[in-house]
């Protein structure tokens, strides 16, 4: 079992005070477990899970498959009513609230770790445009009742590295 980053690196970041969150990884061999099998198992212990592929431009297969489970925070916004965990607020600018959350949970990018070590996963609906660009008049009826924003903050991530398997 290999842990990254080193204890010395963790101490240096902690002493610098630049980040409240430090990603730490444990490398395990997963010869017999596929990402789909891992997701199936995660769904047995967490009601909120995701699977995200990292396919880059013009690649047929991406290097990583990311799975997340047990979100730390649930964030939704509908009609300027935002819910962050158990806190409800009225806001004209949900993107500002999201930037504050991202700043609070910002972590360093470490070269020995996968490019995604946690963060927000979910969606912004088409109707989110009304917050980002108020000059665009969206006269649409929301017959589906989708939330304008539905995100979850994940700090538990499993990364399958297909190049190293």
Name what the model sees in each region.
Residues 1-165:
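Signature of the chorismate-utilizing enzyme
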């Amino acid at each position: 079992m290999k842990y990254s980053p080193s204890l010395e690196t963790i101490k240096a970041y902690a002493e610098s005070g630049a980040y409240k969150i430090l990603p730490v990884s444990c490398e395990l061999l997963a010869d017999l477990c596929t990402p789909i099998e891992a997701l199936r198992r995660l769904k047995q212990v967490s009601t909120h899970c995701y699977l995200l592929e990292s396919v880059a431009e013009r690649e047929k297969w991406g290097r990583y498959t990311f799975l997340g489970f047990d979100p730390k925070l649930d964030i939704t916004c509908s009609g300027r009513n935002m819910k962050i965990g158990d806190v409800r607020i009225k806001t004209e600018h949900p993107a500002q609230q999201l930037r504050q959350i991202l700043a609070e949970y910002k972590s360093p990018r470490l070269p020995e770790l996968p490019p995604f070590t946690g963060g927000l996963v979910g969606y912004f609906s088409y109707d989110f445009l009304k917050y980002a660009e108020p000059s665009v008049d969206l006269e649409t009826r929301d017959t589906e009742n989708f939330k304008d924003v539905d995100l979850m903050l994940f700090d538990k991530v499993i990364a399958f590295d297909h190049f190293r398997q």
